[in-house]
């Protein structure tokens, strides 16, 4: 088992990564030093079918445990499910000494974390990620739900008390889900280290990753995320670099429809656009074509479809929560491991997106 400590201005908590460590979840939770009256497991239908009963059985060794199950998919990051979980928490008589267990992927972590942040003005929660994608979202304290007009527009910063990452649970993921999570690993490499990126690009198939390779990759990705969050918990500065590819990526998700395209696939396209602009505007020296072809071989889409106009995407980006006064704070790379923020107007975005689409043959 690997252990990593996350330190922010508001909290310090451990991240445990290992094969089969869910069997020790009671000991791991107890070791944090927090005492709980009741636990509420929040999970989705897909995860519940595989791990729900086992997790209840493990946690009931020490605590009174309740469970609420929401539909699988991005659609559950909604006002309706947010209210539904609150209703269950009230019915189960959770108090301020209770704890919510987020058992699932990024959707569950965001949703359950936001419930924890708001229920009785804030109770503890613990992340138990079951997807590769959640290696990014489980650390850092961002919680929230979507609005029909945009992704993650309603939420709060609320750090977990621990992250318990059992890599054996990744074995049940589909190829699509693994790829979605791997996009965030690529992002962490791009903003941190040429060596990390080269290591990733030696992977020819996600199916070929051994458990030890997977744990090592996750540790590196989480280490990058933790080091940034420790410097900037509330995204006033360098934490914004974690949004590489996310401005267009979120626009793609919102426009295509949440759940129609995976988060990782949308971010993969967004990163291709960001790297194009970085190359043209900042002189980024990166074998962009080589990276694009490698990502295509892994199954990623690398360009937008022709049926949605540039204006539609630009309007979505201007409405993004990272926009300021009609301009978008866009993450670019001077070089691998050296990210910067650039302000783009609506006209700037339209020009760059048109030029990129023209190069890709999808204008």
From Swiss-Prot:
- Taxonomic source organism: Bacillus pumilus (strain SAFR-032)
Phylogenetic placement of the source organism:
Bacteria, Bacillati, Bacillota, Bacilli, Bacillales
Q: What does this protein do?
A: Catalyzes the conversion of 3-deoxy-D-arabino-heptulosonate 7-phosphate (DAHP) to dehydroquinate (DHQ).
UniProt entry keywords in alphabetical sequence? Amino-acid biosynthesis, Aromatic amino acid biosynthesis, Cobalt, Cytoplasm, Lyase, Metal-binding, NAD, Nucleotide-binding, Zinc
Gene Ontology terms: biological process: amino acid biosynthetic process; aromatic amino acid family biosynthetic process; chorismate biosynthetic process
Q: GO cellular-component terms in the record?
A: cytoplasm
PANTHER family the UniProt entry points to: 3-DEHYDROQUINATE SYNTHASE, 3-DEHYDROQUINATE SYNTHASE, CHLOROPLASTIC
Q: Where in the cell is it found?
A: Cytoplasm
Task: Give the EC number.
Answer: 4.2.3.4
Under which pathway is this protein filed? Metabolic intermediate biosynthesis; chorismate biosynthesis; chorismate from D-erythrose 4-phosphate and phosphoenolpyruvate: step 2/7
| Annotated family | Belongs to the sugar phosphate cyclases superfamily. Dehydroquinate synthase family.
- Which SUPFAM superfamilies has this protein been placed in? Dehydroquinate synthase-like
GO molecular function terms here? 3-dehydroquinate synthase activity; metal ion binding; nucleotide binding
Q: Give the cofactor binding note.
A: Binds 1 divalent metal cation per subunit. Can use either Co(2+) or Zn(2+).
Keyword match Nucleotide-binding: yes
Which catalysed reactions does the entry list for this protein?
Answer: 7-phospho-2-dehydro-3-deoxy-D-arabino-heptonate = 3-dehydroquinate + phosphate
Keyword Nucleotide-binding tagged: yes
Its required cofactor(s), as named, are: Co(2+); Zn(2+); NAD(+)
The name this protein carries in UniProt is 3-dehydroquinate synthase
């Amino acid at each position: 088992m690997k252990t990593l400590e996350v330190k922010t201005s508001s909290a310090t908590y451990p991240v445990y990564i290992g094969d089969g460590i869910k069997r020790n979840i009671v000991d791991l939770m107890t070791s944090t030093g927090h005492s709980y009256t009741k636990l509420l497991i929040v999970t989705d239908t897909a995860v519940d079918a595989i791990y729900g009963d086992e997790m209840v059985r493990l946690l009931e060794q020490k605590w009174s445990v309740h469970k609420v199950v929401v539909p699988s998919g991005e659609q559950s990051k909604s006002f309706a499910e947010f209210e539904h979980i609150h209703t269950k928490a009230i019915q189960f008589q959770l108090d301020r000494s209770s704890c919510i267990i987020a058992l699932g992927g990024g959707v569950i972590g965001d949703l359950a974390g936001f419930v924890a942040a708001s229920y009785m003005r804030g109770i503890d929660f613990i992340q138990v990620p079951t997807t590769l994608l959640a290696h990014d979202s489980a650390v850092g304290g961002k919680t929230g739900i979507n609005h029909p007009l945009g992704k993650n527009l309603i939420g709060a910063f609320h750090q977990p008390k621990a992250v318990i990452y059992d890599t054996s649970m990744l074995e049940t993921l589909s190829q699509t889900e693994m790829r979605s999570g791997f996009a965030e690993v690529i992002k962490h490499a791009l903003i941190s280290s040429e060596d990390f990126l080269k290591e990733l690009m030696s992977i020819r198939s996600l199916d070929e990753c051994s458990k030890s390779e997977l744990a090592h990759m996750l540790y590196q990705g989480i280490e990058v995320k933790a080091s940034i969050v420790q410097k900037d918990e509330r995204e006033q500065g360098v934490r914004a670099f974690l949004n590489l590819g996310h401005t267009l990526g979120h626009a793609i998700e919102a426009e295509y429809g949440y759940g129609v395209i995976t988060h990782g696939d949308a971010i993969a396209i967004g990163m291709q656009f960001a790297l194009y602009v970085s190359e043209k505007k900042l002189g980024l020296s990166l074998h962009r074509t080589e990276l694009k072809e490698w990502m295509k071989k892994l199954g990623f889409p690398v360009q937008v479809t022709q049926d949605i106009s540039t204006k539609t995407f630009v309007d979505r980006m201007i409405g993004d929560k990272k926009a300021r006064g009609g301009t978008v704070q866009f993450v670019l790379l001077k070089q691998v491991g050296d990210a910067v923020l650039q302000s783009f107007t609506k006209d700037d975005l339209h020009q760059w997106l048109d030029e990129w689409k023209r190069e890709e043959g999808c204008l």
